[in-house]
Amino acid sequence: MTHKIIVALDFPAGAPALALADRLDPARCRLKVGKELFTAAGPDLVRALVARGFEVFLDLKFHDIPNTVAAACRAAAGLGVWMLNVHAAGGRRMMDAAREALESLPPGDGAADTPQRPLLIAVTVLTSMSAGDLAETGVADTPAEQVMRLARLAHACALDGVVCSAQEAAGLRAALGADFRLVTPGIRPAGAAAADQRRVMTPVEALRAGATDLVIGRPITGAGDPLAALAAIQADIEENLGRAF
């Protein structure tokens, strides 16, 4: 099976995002909708992507009091999304409330073609954050140490996985087991610019380190032929790992 990369739709409006989606194949990739696009285009954009057959990762990083986050998770499930996330820094009670809100939904509550509840993952440390950045917020640990602490908390709250840098993936995989999803942004094919993410790896490096889901944006969305760019990355994964990953 071809590895389904999560393509980040980092667009300022709905029209170019939908135009890009129409040049991709839902059998080959999933799509990520983040804060900018969701703020500009709203829930209707998510519904339109789901209607096109795409599994959508709603990347809004909910972080609020437990009741508010639980309500937001239920609303996201109603859009038919495949996966959503919260900030692990919101703490145990917030993550428990988010998980319980999704577990309380009957099968099919999200959408007619989405019988299972959305996956719920937690954000650990943003990939743009360095040790110095963390220190300025009062966190004395290194990014890797803080990632491990927050990932262990998310695991204890029975979430499905975490967002993390691929550089932390091997340690998290060893500590948290084979069934915990590791969703890794900061992925750039060999030769691509790192842009605004500091802790980056290539797709093959990230998968070898233990990542389960790769988030890739500009190398695909900025390509003249996005589907060909996606296929090239997937072919490189298969060639280097010896199988379709």
From Swiss-Prot:
Keywords from the named record: Decarboxylase, Lyase, Pyrimidine biosynthesis
Keyword Lyase in annotation: yes
Assembly and binders: Homodimer.
Active site: K61 (proton donor)
PROSITE patterns, sorted: OMPDECASE (PS00156)
One GO process term, biological-process aspect: 'de novo' UMP biosynthetic process
Gene Ontology cellular-component annotations: cytosol
Function: Catalyzes the decarboxylation of orotidine 5'-monophosphate (OMP) to uridine 5'-monophosphate (UMP).
EC numbers on record: 4.1.1.23
Pathway where it operates: Pyrimidine metabolism; UMP biosynthesis via de novo pathway; UMP from orotate: step 2/2
InterPro entries: Aldolase_TIM (IPR013785), OMPdecase (IPR014732), OMPdecase_AS (IPR018089), OMPdecase_bac (IPR047596), OMPdeCOase_dom (IPR001754), RibuloseP-bd_barrel (IPR011060)
Top-level EC class as recorded in UniProt: lyase
UniProt source species: Thiobacillus denitrificans (strain ATCC 25259 / T1)
Sequence positions that bind substrate: 10, 32, 59-68, 127, 188, 197, 217-218
SUPFAM superfamilies for the chain: Ribulose-phoshate binding barrel
Record GO terms (molecular function): orotidine-5'-phosphate decarboxylase activity
Protein name: Orotidine 5'-phosphate decarboxylase
Family statement drawn from the similarity comment of this UniProt entry: Belongs to the OMP decarboxylase family. Type 1 subfamily.
HAMAP family named among the record's database cross-references: OMPdecase_type1_B
Reactions catalysed according to its record: orotidine 5'-phosphate + H(+) = UMP + CO2
